[in-house]
Amino acid sequence: MTNIRKSHPLIKIINHSFIDLPTPSNISAWWNFGSLLGVCLILQILTGLFLAMHYTSDTMTAFSSVTHICRDVNYGWIIRYMHANGASMFFICLYMHVGRGMYYGSYTFSETWNIGIMLLFAVMATAFMGYVLPWGQMSFWGATVITNLLSAIPYIGTNLVEWIWGGFSVDKATLTRFFAFHFILPFIISALAAVHLLFLHETGSNNPSGITSDSDKIPFHPYYTTKDILGLLALILTLMLLVLFLPDMLGDPDNYIPANPLNTPPHIKPEWYFLFAYAILRSIPNKLGGVLALVLSILILAMIPTLHTSKQRGMMFRPLSQCLFWLLVADLLTLTWIGGQPVEHPFITIGQLASVLYFSTLLILMPISGIIENRLLKW
């Protein structure tokens, strides 16, 4: 008799995805982030569900309902902080995952890569709308500033913004629809993640060497299930340290002030994980130009497979490209720092230089380094 996990129609899918999946024998801890992202998504859906049971999406009561969750609901404070800091952990894992894909040339799996970019946009949209829900000062002004960027679109911009707002300003209609979208998007993300995995399992995983590993595969379970548990424990430890000791470290103090349309905060800024894109937006004095740069800062990922000029897949044996990759990482950290600073000298200049470096590294320097490395191979 055949084992049930190999014969049952439903369990068979799980078996082929997580148990008997042929996996390269040499993948490192950088391949752990995919499973960690899955854990983050499940955690966010569960904590979000419990928060939604007590939250009210009305401008009059939203702020006090979040306060009520923290003060009166049984363990409401820990659920709220796990959800807020869970989003930060989600983005840390997400950026590491994308960075690993860029370093080891995983973008050559074009379908998997493109669905990954769609996932990134969906997660960013979800996080942005979630930040609006507590209806604090930064929630309100963040929503106003970011949605208002759409007015830069010629002809239809103003109508589009008013359509998204559901009125002539960010108000009750905006909050209600943002809550509805924030609730539904994680389920769309789950479906996209399933398609992401489907395409990945069509080709099999990449590995650090960048060479095909068909001749050297091992089953996912028990080898990588146990390896992933280590990463999972590290993730949970970091998250719980944040939640229990520094719950507000990554948040903005202004969001503890109820939203007031008549009082603008001194520095409007998004959550830390959007600061690099916000810095790129601010570095261009023109509104439409800034919006285009903002979108391109993420959409440029879709161009990476086209810009790949090297004969080697990953950067494992390409020191010049490695230097540029870590320059890009340092540049993104600089942009993140600049995004949180006020718009004044010298931060404006640093932001503009970092933005130019970001685009020139990806569009010009990396393709050139690939060509140079190809030439060096012939010597």
Curated annotation (Swiss-Prot):
Q: Which InterPro entries match?
A: Cyt_b/b6_C, Cyt_b/b6_C_sf, Cyt_b/b6_N, Cytb/b6-like_sf, Cytochrome_b, Cytochrome_b_C_euk/bac, Cytochrome_b_N_euk/bac, Di-haem_cyt_TM
Name the domain of life.
Eukaryota
Residues where a ubiquinone binds? 201
Question: Which cofactors does this gene product need?
Answer: heme b
Keywords annotated in UniProt: Electron transport, Heme, Iron, Membrane, Metal-binding, Mitochondrion, Mitochondrion inner membrane, Respiratory chain, Transmembrane, Transmembrane helix, Transport, Ubiquinone
- A single BP term in Gene Ontology: mitochondrial electron transport, ubiquinol to cytochrome c
The compartments listed are: Mitochondrion inner membrane
Cofactor, how bound (note): Binds 2 heme b groups non-covalently.
Entry's transmembrane regions: 33-53, 77-98, 113-133, 178-198, 226-246, 288-308, 320-340, 347-367
Q: Name one GO molecular function term.
A: metal ion binding
**Positions annotated to bind heme b b566:** 97, 196
| Record-listed heme b b562 binding positions | 83, 182
Q: Which GO terms describe its cellular component?
A: mitochondrial inner membrane; respiratory chain complex III
Q: What topology does the record note for this protein and the membrane?
A: Multi-pass membrane protein
Matching entries from PROSITE patterns are given as: CYTB_CTER, CYTB_NTER
Any miscellaneous information on file?
Heme 1 (or BL or b562) is low-potential and absorbs at about 562 nm, and heme 2 (or BH or b566) is high-potential and absorbs at about 566 nm.
Family label:
Belongs to the cytochrome b family.
Function of the molecule: Component of the ubiquinol-cytochrome c reductase complex (complex III or cytochrome b-c1 complex) that is part of the mitochondrial respiratory chain. The b-c1 complex mediates electron transfer from ubiquinol to cytochrome c. Contributes to the generation of a proton gradient across the mitochondrial membrane that is then used for ATP synthesis.
What's the subunit arrangement here?
Answer: The cytochrome bc1 complex contains 11 subunits: 3 respiratory subunits (MT-CYB, CYC1 and UQCRFS1), 2 core proteins (UQCRC1 and UQCRC2) and 6 low-molecular weight proteins (UQCRH/QCR6, UQCRB/QCR7, UQCRQ/QCR8, UQCR10/QCR9, UQCR11/QCR10 and a cleavage product of UQCRFS1). This cytochrome bc1 complex then forms a dimer.
Q: What is this protein called?
A: Cytochrome b
Q: What is the lineage of its organism?
A: Eukaryota, Metazoa, Chordata, Craniata, Vertebrata
